[in-house]
């Protein structure tokens, strides 16, 4: 009997940072079961993700999370067609837990193993939007998250060309650091956005680093330093003892968020314009932008990107907010590698880190 899209099932596993996630996805894209275990309360007291704590939490949760996804889907391991796991990039200990689990299950159930690039999967989440075209590629892709801020030419879901990225801090990292300066709860990016919506985004004139640079690289460390000096002045280390008014916090957040979004939107517009009529070849023209990653849930970024798309006449698809943060559903990209017969061996190793070029 020939398998059909309704009978072929994928188990997707995600453990790149501090979310342990699994999903069972049919080949037609239907999600039959999914589970995410977050670690926010474990890392809250530290103001950021502690790699060793994250890895230990993954160890405790990986099997229950997988079991929950399978139970929701009402399938057994033997019913699966393939197993996919994100093996790059991310925290070494976190990645290792997911990859070892996937390899073990692939061996035990005699299923093909598929390795995933976590960042490429974030972009593929745009393909999962209701109403998206059957093939959302080619496109310019923007990943904006706590660990990465990068631009790509996405020829297909699994054929991406890295254009450029941050040379220092990622946008999401800058959000979290500013939140820490203002003693806001973890995770800080959400809290900064909340206060920003109530503040004056012109109260502080923060730098838009590299906004006029013709390339595709980003820089946010200078912005982070400018915010620090606006709050405490040069040289001071102690933020906890500061008495910062609520209005100042709102205005700092609004001005900071505006600076980040201005840079992201400007770089995307420039990349689209450059590739729209590349070499005057309509066959290679790209007039679509896809956006993924945790910061892609930011409402100001979504609004300003849509305004740019309307003004410049390009097509915009941003991952739905629930698929912007780390999840296993975006692992549906594995079906593209399955179709291309791009399988991993049981010797699969992790590729951790936040290096440029992923």
Swiss-Prot record:
Cofactor dependence: Fe(2+)
Cell compartments where the protein resides: Cytoplasm
Transmembrane portions of the chain: none
Enzyme class, first EC level, given as a word: transferase
Disulfide pairings: none
SUPFAM superfamilies: Actin-like ATPase domain
Catalytic activity: L-threonylcarbamoyladenylate + adenosine(37) in tRNA = N(6)-L-threonylcarbamoyladenosine(37) in tRNA + AMP + H(+)
Gene3D superfamilies membership: 3.30.420.40
GO CC annotation: cytoplasm
Matching InterPro entries: ATPase_NBD, Gcp-like_dom, KAE1/TsaD, Peptidase_M22_CS, TsaD
GO biological process terms held by the UniProt record: tRNA threonylcarbamoyladenosine modification
Main location class: cytoplasm
Keywords in alphabetical order: Acyltransferase, Cytoplasm, Iron, Metal-binding, Transferase, tRNA processing
Positions annotated to bind substrate: 143-147, 176, 189, 298
Any one Pfam family match given in the protein's UniProt record, by short name: TsaD
Details of cofactor binding: Binds 1 Fe(2+) ion per subunit.
MF-aspect GO terms: iron ion binding; N(6)-L-threonylcarbamoyladenine synthase activity
Residue sites binding Fe cation per the record: 118, 122, 326
EC number: 2.3.1.234
Family assignment from sequence similarity: Belongs to the KAE1 / TsaD family.
Role, per record: Required for the formation of a threonylcarbamoyl group on adenosine at position 37 (t(6)A37) in tRNAs that read codons beginning with adenine. Is involved in the transfer of the threonylcarbamoyl moiety of threonylcarbamoyl-AMP (TC-AMP) to the N6 group of A37, together with TsaE and TsaB. TsaD likely plays a direct catalytic role in this reaction.
Name of the protein in question: tRNA N6-adenosine threonylcarbamoyltransferase
Lineage, opening ranks: Bacteria, Pseudomonadati, Planctomycetota, Planctomycetia, Pirellulales
Gene name tied to this protein: tsaD
């Amino acid at each position: 009997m020939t398998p059909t899209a309704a009978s072929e099932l994928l188990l997707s596993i995600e453990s790149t940072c501090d979310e342990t996630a699994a999903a069972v996805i049919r080949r037609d894209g239907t999600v039959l079961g999914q589970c995410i275990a977050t670690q926010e309360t474990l890392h809250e007291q530290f103001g950021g993700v502690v790699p060793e704590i994250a890895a230990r939490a993954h160890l405790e949760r990986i099997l229950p999370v997988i079991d929950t996804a399978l139970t929701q889907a009402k399938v057994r391991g033997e019913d699966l067609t393939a197993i996919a796991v994100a093996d790059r990039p991310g925290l070494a200990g976190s990645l290792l837990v997911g990859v070892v689990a996937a390899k073990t299950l692939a061996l035990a159930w005699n299923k093909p193993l598929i390795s995933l690039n976590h960042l490429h999967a974030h972009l593929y989440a745009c393909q999962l939007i209701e109403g998206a075209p059957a093939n959302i590629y080619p496109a310019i892709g923007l990943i904006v998250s706590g660990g990465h801020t990068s631009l790509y030419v996405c020829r297909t879901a699994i054929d991406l060309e890295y254009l450029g990225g941050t040379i220092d801090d990622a946008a999401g990292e800058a959000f979290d650091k500013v939140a820490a300066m203002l003693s806001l709860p973890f995770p800080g990016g959400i809290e900064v956005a909340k206060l920003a919506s109530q503040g004056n985004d012109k109260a502080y004139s923060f730098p838009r680093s590299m906004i006029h640079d013709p390339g595709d690289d980003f820089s946010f460390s200078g912005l982070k330093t400018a915010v620090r000096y606006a709050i405490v002045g040069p040289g001071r280390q102690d933020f906890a003892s500061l008495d910062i008014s609520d209005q100042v916090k709102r205005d700092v957040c609004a001005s900071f968020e505006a600076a980040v979004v201005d840079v992201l939107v400007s770089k995307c517009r420039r990349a689209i314009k450059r590739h729209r009529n590349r070499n005057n070849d309509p066959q290679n023209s790209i007039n679509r932008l896809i956006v993924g990653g945790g910061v892609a849930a930011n409402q100001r970024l979504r609004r300003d990107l849509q305004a740019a798309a309307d003004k410049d006449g390009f097509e915009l698809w941003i991952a739905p907010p629930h698929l912007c943060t780390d999840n296993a559903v975006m692992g549906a990209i594995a079906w593209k590698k399955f179709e291309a017969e791009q399988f991993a061996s049981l010797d699969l190793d992790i590729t951790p880190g936040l290096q440029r070029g992923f």
